[in-house]
Amino acid sequence: MKASKYILPTEKENPSDAVVASHRLMIRAGLARKSSAGLYFYLPLGLKILQKIKQIIREEMNKTGALEFDLPILTPSDFWEQSGRWTAMGKEMFRIKDRHDLSYALGPTHEESFSFLLKPLLKSYKDLPLNVYQIQTKFRDEIRPRFGVIRSREFIMKDAYSFHIDDVSLDETYQSMRAAYRKIFDRCGLKTIPVQADSGSMGGSASEEFMVVSPIGEETLLLCNSCGYSSNSEKTPLVLKKENVSSASVEKKEISTPGKKTIVEVSAFLGIPESTTIKAATLKSEKKKILVYLRGDLELNLHKLHSLLRIVDSEPMTDAEIRELGLVPGFIAPVAPNDKVKVLYDRSLQKDFPYVVASNKEDFHTQGFVLEKEVSGLPEFADVALAREGDLCPNCNAPLKAEKGIEVGHIFKLGEKYTKAFGIQVLDQNGKARTLTMGCYGIGVNRTMATVIEQRNDEKGIFWPISIAPFEVTLVSITKGEEQYSKAEEFYNVLKNENLEVFWDDRDVGPGFKLKDSELIGFPIRVTIGKKFFENGEISIYNRKADKEESFVFAGFENLIARVESLRQELFAELE
């Protein structure tokens, strides 16, 4: 491909609204342009990268025996009503109506559609296991699109779904897909960590996210360097160090705390550790009001709470709603379970410890409050607090380390949630009808592209892994006149005829401009022929990842091809 015949709108300046490297460099390198909030145009260079990522995904999926499909993006509301997710998906799902007043969703995921499609096609255990996938545009009505294509409203996803006669078969495919995902991300040049995760509205039992450690990550990962445990903080069980709770006064008495509503204010006013206090969180869902008590130095983990109560979402109660329960906003004392509100106590609390708690009276707290003495019918304690760095590993009790991460893939064991909803059954070996069990496996294609940039950039620009670079080799020629141009074209044709992906920068611009563009875009290998070549036969080969250039006297095309191919193989070997 010749640059003179290509769209190559590189930019010197960073876009004003870009706050992360991938967003800045995708725009500056001419890979994409913004359409509107969370929507992007992909230009030829960017599209080539996406196509290569898709091809790697396709190859590894096909190796597992998965079959590729293509389903409609527009999905009838009936499918979502049948699974119970028309409401559960919340405001992030785009919903539209046609001229006949029929409702549809722009598919954010396709469990329902594949279930509807495959129900009449699967009749016997002999048809199983079946693993199906597609690579398709999805939609999510993000309230705040950010970080370029990392969190956008329209995105490309590989979504796969597997159907099984039993959990043993599901686990075999789950492990096969787990291995395939590691291979996909390795081939894309990404270092990923599989972490235990919350299944959310997808449902099911086991769930793992493939995370890339990055300071811009929106997820918090908790990792154990001792045993290798890894988990999203949303999922991590809280295991506290015993010394987290210090001694406190045993005498029970009410104390004045004028204007002190928060735990920080109360503990500072009384000169006590936050860990010796109890705080309350007041929430409501569509079906119930919820009152959660936890240790004052901890935060409520909404994902754990929602999973425990099997609710999709919750929001804070208003002061009026709190008062309806006979409680004083800002000064809520521990209460016993009752029929007005669902009461939960976090397992970080000790039943026999004398805590400082609110007195359910304006501007007063009580010290020496022992739960097992003061709260009748104390319920079983639940794990609903957020684990943090320094808390203990649930496997080996070593301290956990926190990292920020970007999710690029997610695999689930869905169980029978969708097969039951759609009545998907087959006859087993004994002729008995069996409800199938499912798995689900997703990869964000655009997000993978952007995350590679986050991991592989420097002050000059991007350095793509050779597997997904828009072109493997760029030929930069600095010529004067027809004769020199023709010689450069000979180099281009020879390289191209060796089945190398070559991008020839034959534009009539200065040498500095060409060299900087090649480094900004991130072509893995650069061959430069310029003034030194036409004077004394000297050419150079540049390794973008190593930022290293080697100059040598041209000794024929066979020698040049050997040098380029050697570097090419070296760069591919790094991805294995």
From Swiss-Prot:
Pfam families: HGTP_anticodon, tRNA-synt_2b, tRNA_edit. GO terms for molecular function: aminoacyl-tRNA deacylase activity; ATP binding; proline-tRNA ligase activity. It catalyses: tRNA(Pro) + L-proline + ATP = L-prolyl-tRNA(Pro) + AMP + diphosphate. It comes from the Bacteria. PROSITE patterns: AA_TRNA_LIGASE_II. InterPro entries: aa-tRNA-synt_IIb (IPR002314), aa-tRNA-synth_II (IPR006195), aa-tRNA-synth_II/BPL/LPL (IPR045864), Anticodon-bd (IPR004154), Anticodon-bd_dom_sf (IPR036621), Pro-tRNA-ligase_IIa (IPR002316), Pro-tRNA-synth_IIa_bac-type (IPR004500), Pro-tRNA-Synthase_IIa_type1 (IPR023717). Its EC number is 6.1.1.15. Its main location: cytoplasm. Homodimer. HAMAP family: Pro_tRNA_synth_type1. PANTHER family: MITOCHONDRIAL RIBOSOME PROTEIN L39/PROLYL-TRNA LIGASE FAMILY MEMBER, PROLINE--TRNA LIGASE. Belongs to the class-II aminoacyl-tRNA synthetase family. ProS type 1 subfamily. Catalyzes the attachment of proline to tRNA(Pro) in a two-step reaction: proline is first activated by ATP to form Pro-AMP and then transferred to the acceptor end of tRNA(Pro). As ProRS can inadvertently accommodate and process non-cognate amino acids such as alanine and cysteine, to avoid such errors it has two additional distinct editing activities against alanine. One activity is designated as 'pretransfer' editing and involves the tRNA(Pro)-independent hydrolysis of activated Ala-AMP. This is Proline--tRNA ligase. It comes from Leptospira borgpetersenii serovar Hardjo-bovis (strain L550). The lineage of its organism: Bacteria, Pseudomonadati, Spirochaetota, Spirochaetia, Leptospirales. The gene is proS.
